[in-house]
Amino acid sequence: MNYDEKIILKKVQLPYTFNDVEPVYLTEATMEQRAKKVLDLMKEDNFDSLVIYADKEHGSNFEYLTGFIPRFEEGLFVLKKTGQASFILGNENLKMSKYARLQGELYHYPLFSLPNQPMENEKSLDSILSDIDFSNDKKIGLIGWKMFTSTQYDNSAIFDIPHFIVEAVRNICTIEAEIVNAAYLFIGGGKGARTINNANEIAHYEYGANLSSTSMLKAMNAVEIGVKESYLGNLLNAEGQTNNVVTIAATGVRFEKANLYPTSKQLKLGDTLSLTTGYKGGLSSRAGFVVESAEQLPDNQRDYLEKVAIPYFKTVVFWLENIRIGMYGGEFYKMIEEVYPKEKYHWHLNPGHLVADEEWMSSPIYPSSKETLKSGMVFQIDIIPFITGYGGVSAEECIALADEELRNQINNEYPHLWGRIEKRRYYIQHELGINLPEHVIPLSNLVAYLRPFFLNKSATLTCVK
């Protein structure tokens, strides 16, 4: 794209949506591949054991190997370099070990249970870990969810799991044993096991990307003066699936009384509106105004389209047309900053990040990054400008990078998914005027679909060729 190419608000057809897509389970072959990837990385970096923590909010690394999270309890999964696996679970998750995708020895630790539940079979965590045996381990990785990336501290010595667990591991190891944060083995952009997805995993995650974008379009189409935030919030949640972000349906002044959730507040003409929903595999987010045309904008924001929405949309188009497999994340970051200067538009987060079970897993796109963008990575387009005196703008959606081999695998193994991808591609190219490269496969139905005026439901920003 020529960055100076003309952008106009134009009447277009609504994007395709798909309402009856069934979830895709991860296959046994995929789960075996996941375990092998982690074991290979353990060998490469000389780890004897990994101790992986999980709770409801921080369970993705645990779930990557086991297939489940311990919901309202805590849990530990211990993986030895030999492949030996152990589960340490509370009262209400003992049954889950027999359903786990990777089998292992079960240890009951009732202190992982909810307060005041029975403490039968109580045994110290030190004792359980001693039974698993770390006595000969020279290097142990503790993994919660977060990979720390401080420029001032030793990231390997910062742990995001409860202190009593860290202390128990220290107590049962030899003095010489090295204990480090090893989350990078899972989510590090350079080589983390979870950063690259096969065809089965992309099909698995596309379910959530399709669901979030389908729900988003339903909510956008329901925007009317007088509609309540809670009504839109209900449309954003679908099929009983657990969100991986807080659902947002917020109009006018946000965060009143520190509230984060949709309320009974009604939409008014001229108000700002933010909508967000997300599931495993992708988030959809929109921000704009409850108006039909620029004439209905607040007097001091009549140029919102020219000052805010169009420059943002141009950058989304540039992002899609210029991201490449094999480029450094730092190179792409620099390209985005050149066409959408931080100094002018005041964005400060990464202009794109990896997506998986969690909405933001990690990002190879940061200043001077030498992490390579690879086939199989699933990305969220995530650029958040802050322009003083103006309402916000957003069109966050999900894509994957796929080389020819991966595209052929998806086509052959999941032809219905490939059909959806092709319909989305056609829409992006022919309705929105974007030259979408073959290696960029849209997992969301609303990639680059931006309606800045919510009451004008037929007009979106497009590229004029």
Regions found by a protein language model. Name each.
Residues 1-465:
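Active-site neighborhoods and metal-handling regions in enzymes and metal-associated proteins
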